[in-house]
Amino acid sequence: MKHVIKRDGSSAAFDAGKIRVAIENAMLETTKGTDGKLSAEIASAIETQVGMSEREVNVEDLQDLVEDYLMSSERKDAAKKYIIYRYERDKTRDARKRRDGNLLADAFVAGFKHKPSPMNQLGSFVYYRTYSRWVPEEARREYWWETARRAVEYNCSIVPTSKEEAEQLYRNVFDLKQFLSGRTFWIGGTEVSRHYPMANYNCSFQVVDNFSAFRDVFYLLMVGSGVGVRVLKSDVAKMPKVRTDAEVIHEAYTPMLRSLRQDSSALEFSRGDTARIVIGDSKEGWVQAMEYFLKLHYSTEYRKINTIILNYDQVRSKGERLQTFGGTASGHQSMKNMFAKISNVLRKAARRSAADHVRLAPIDCLDIANIIGENVVVGGVRRTAEIVLVDQDDRDSILAKSELYKKSEDEKWVVDPEIAHRQMSNNSIYYRKKPTREDLHWHFTQMRYSGEPGWVNEEAGAKRRPNFNGVNPCAEILLDSKGLCNLTTVNVMGFARGGDGRLDRKGLLEAQRLSARAGLRMTCPELEIPEWNAVQQRDRLLGCSLTGWQDMVNAVGLSRDEQIELLKELRAAATEAAREYARELGLTEPLLVTT
């Protein structure tokens, strides 16, 4: 068999499959897509030519042949992409070698680099849309093997991890047998993950019993976490009253030069009764500006302020690229809309109470949380995921979406722009005691029309967690206020051996243990908001979850009793691994381990 000389001087057996994969990767970057027949023909032709050669063949020779064959075919578009990819990789090779001191060495990852993608077309679409980061030095997006490497290396670098564990985790992730959180696949190993650790977390929850809760909700949504919000009457009653008689003025937008922009927001005062908020050009600046805005309305320190001016000049223009998080800027208009809508909520509360100094109702807090989410979802690649938990007897909040649509002049149903922000959350009743049969009958009748409201049972949640106070937007994690959780997932169908109807039980249980260990590592970074970090260090919640269960059951034919037994084994494997690892690292044991 012919051998190929690699760049480090070692040799490896010629593999036509690697040639085919390289060609198809180039084709994937074109509008015409892949041509499996052509890639196989070229790979076969190169194999024949290499076999006839009397001299040694190196990697550069093979790449030259791929270029020649593609250029002589009808797929010159793929040839161009291949040439560009090769050129950009050559330019960055030395830099990549210098940083190859990681757990996953190039020699190990090379075995996956030329494997066909394990994803189908839909999976590939979701991956490139959601998780593949732009590689500026090579003018392309990441491939799956690179994303998996970046995320796994980040996770395993948080605390000392063995090379063997990192490699096994990588194998499973690459083969779609298990996953780290989607957030970590997007930001793991980037500057974002180091400066904004909370951006790794899928799940968070906040009780709205003070105005700083809105600051935290805004920040978490900005860094990509889904947020659960609770606005019970007893929660909102703890908040101070707000003044609603201040005039809010939005200055005309004149964008500042990039070199002159300030990241932080500023609060300026004049004439003793006027405050001006200059909104900074950063996540922190936006959050700070909203905190100033709310404080000017509720703090007695600012009771003499009757005019609030908002200046947006520092905010970058719409469409500018966001270098750190990725995507493009939403511009100043979304911020302006947010402040205008919050002002409307305060004025509505004043009209409802016939007073200028009022206490907000739960529906007002629901609106503010949704308005914040609406602002966040406008920009870049960010999305907003919210759930709002409301009282059983709070009909205003329960029916918040009942008039979301109205008829236009041409008799079409359209979203009412004044309350369009209410689309941002799923809303659920927070039952503090078991509902009656009549309650449930009414509840199901409501759900028949729109699927809402859902419900959360505090009694049931408290049995698993005494300090249970709410949930994340997907409602699979039991959380205390200011609590976070980072999901890790095992795809059980990935362990159903193809064709023979058997389950790789040993591999599945080992993956579950790896899942728990990966989750515990994610509780170790110090979070950027101290109150949230304190809860995190106290609870260290893990979110070991399973997917593909029914597919696996159908594939291997498990009975109900066998399913119950396997689920017990998986729960025990995760719990034991988490406790053992916590002791090994000298950490408190996780309060909860599985979803």
Language model: regions and residue ranges:
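Extended catalytic cores of very large enzyme megasubunits
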Residues: 1-595
